[in-house]
Amino acid sequence: MSFKVNWNSLETEPLTNWTKELLTSALNSGKSPNILASNITIKDLNFGKIAPDFEILEIGELDRDRFRGIFKIDYQGDFHLTLHTKVQANPLNIYYHNSLEKEVCNCTQDEFITPNFLLSNEQFAIPLDLKLSDIKINGIGIIVFSKSKGLTLVFRNDPLDSIKVSSTFDTVQVLANFLQKQIENQIRDLFRETLPTLIHQLSLKYLSLDNNINEIKSKLSQQDSVSMTNNELASSLKLFDDEENEFPLIYSSKNLQKNMQLFKSRETFRLSVPKFKNIVQRTRLDKFTKSYPNLLNSLYANNVDLQHRYVNNINHNNNNNASSTGIPIELLLSHDDKQHYDKTDSLLKDISSIQANNFYKYSNKDAPTKPKRRRIKVHKKNKSKHDETTTTTSKPSELQNVDNTFMESRSISPQETIDTVSTLIESVPMTRNVSSNIKSPTLDTLSTGSSSAASSQVIAHPTPKRAYQPNDTTTAATTTLNKENHIDYIKARNLYQDFIQMSQSPGYYDKVISNGGGIGLGNNNGGNYFGLERTISSSPIKHLNKDKKSINYIDTSKINEKLNQFRFDGGKNNNTNDNNSKNFRPGFTRNESNGQQGILFEAFNFPSMTAAATPPPPPPYC
């Protein structure tokens, strides 16, 4: 594989000047020999008209941003280079400086005393011009190219075959032979060390712009640090336009060609503007948006009915310059016309398949992952809607009736718990779930004095109440009656607590207080609510617990005999006493014999409670 090099492109003044500067800095780097009386400068540089021949022998690595290969170069052209310098012609001076370097260390050279010979210290410089021409190169080299690191060139062999050296001392044969040998050795060192460095810097100049930009920024920052006048500031801004600047800003030729091609293509009066690859033009943006595949277009393509149904809607959105790529909400809603709209499941499947195809198209095929999507449950019933209707708070009139009435007496089955009987003055929504088979007790109104018509009470969370707060809308008579009933209940409750504490089973009292607190705040504080609650038993034999006898068992028969002595009806309800004593559940009823309100415990069928009455025993231990 071989290719030709456009050698004429190198004949440019900027490249020639830049090459001269690089060669000058390279030749004068390091310590100059004592035979030279001045620095080396490049007087003439010409690349010639004949290009070298390159032949690629092997390609080890080839990619967009890197390349590594072995090539062969053969050059027999008309390249010539002229160097100018001054040579020391006084041999005593040369010998004097050479002896100082060998005998005396450079660090102590100023302190060492030497004889001051006038003849040896005098310099006698002669100008010298060296011309290098007729260069013949034949060698094998290795090229390593990287877009970020530039180009590196290394030769395997000595590529220099011959070179012609001509100077101002050609008339002296001894000096001509000496210069020929010395320059050949220096050129071999040039191909071995200097030329790879020059090529590397040249490649960085045209491939990487970061270094030039960083150098310009550093130079600008140095100039800004020094106080400058307006004229100096204006001159510093011309740094980018100055052709003689040390660090000119150079753009990539490839990018410049693309920009020029785009610019020239618009300098036309043609109606059809030429297209460019991977470029979206503003004049064609509308067509590009319509033809671009999206979710809505895919749905219309898969469903013929949707095309006829929403074609007017799409035209309306396009006329209003609105985005029609969104999915209308009507597609997912069900209407009366099931033939066209009752396709929610199929639409969701189409949307899922389209999104999955797009996801797997751009994802990694080696390690595919499932897309994360949200699950939509269509036609799901709202279960909390029924709970909200049952847990709504009562009206103010109903709250007033709750405050002014008491519970109607009724028998409680073993399956029901004490929580079914509300003991609240003011109803509050209850957070826990209650079984639907538990019915709320009825309420009695004070105006009628009967328990026939009553509304169901809402099961609510107990709220502590320490002081009686009547409603402003109630009448004075109702308020007075409520206070009297409340005082009677407080007396009965206190009497019940005193009786329990004076009984022979204090352990049972402590157990009820500690375990039967129920729900709510202030369970153990006096006057918080109407009665003590029991903990709900989850044992499968909870209905048989009343037959068990524990250490804290209380003989209710003896207590009944004591309580019958304080009855006011003279044993009127003795027949029902035994039957009702089986259900040891506290309840409330109205005493209709004397027309006054009172609190009775259903287990003993006790009528109205007075100051001399004794409360019934507590519920059985379980």
UniProtKB/Swiss-Prot annotation:
Q: Which InterPro entries match?
A: Mdm34, SMP_LBD
Bias (Basic residues): 370-384
Q: Where in the cell is it found?
A: Mitochondrion outer membrane
Q: Enumerate composition-biased segments (Polar residues).
A: 390-399
Membrane topology of this protein: Multi-pass membrane protein
**CDD domains cross-referenced by the UniProt entry:** SMP_Mdm34
Residues of the signal peptide: none
Q: According to the UniProt record, where is the region Disordered?
A: 362-399, 568-592
Q: Which is one GO molecular function term here?
A: lipid binding
Keywords noted in UniProt: Lipid transport, Lipid-binding, Membrane, Mitochondrion, Mitochondrion outer membrane, Transmembrane, Transmembrane beta strand, Transport
The SMP-LTD domain covers 1-204
Compositional bias annotation for Low complexity: 571-583
GO terms, biological process: mitochondrial genome maintenance; mitochondrion-endoplasmic reticulum membrane tethering; phospholipid transport
Cellular component (GO) terms are: ERMES complex
Q: Domain comment?
A: Lacks alpha-helical transmembrane segments, suggesting that it resides in the membrane via beta-sheet conformations similar to those predicted for other outer membrane proteins and porin. The SMP-LTD domain is a barrel-like domain that can bind various types of glycerophospholipids in its interior and mediate their transfer between two adjacent bilayers.
Q: What does this protein do?
A: Component of the ERMES/MDM complex, which serves as a molecular tether to connect the endoplasmic reticulum (ER) and mitochondria. Components of this complex are involved in the control of mitochondrial shape and protein biogenesis, and function in nonvesicular lipid trafficking between the ER and mitochondria. MDM34 is required for the interaction of the ER-resident membrane protein MMM1 and the outer mitochondrial membrane-resident beta-barrel protein MDM10.
Question: Which proteins does it associate with, and in what oligomeric form?
Answer: Component of the ER-mitochondria encounter structure (ERMES) or MDM complex, composed of MMM1, MDM10, MDM12 and MDM34.
- Of which family is this protein a member? Belongs to the MDM34 family.
HAMAP family recorded for this chain? Answer: Mdm34
Protein name, entry field:
Mitochondrial distribution and morphology protein 34
Organism of origin is Candida dubliniensis (strain CD36 / ATCC MYA-646 / CBS 7987 / NCPF 3949 / NRRL Y-17841) (Yeast)
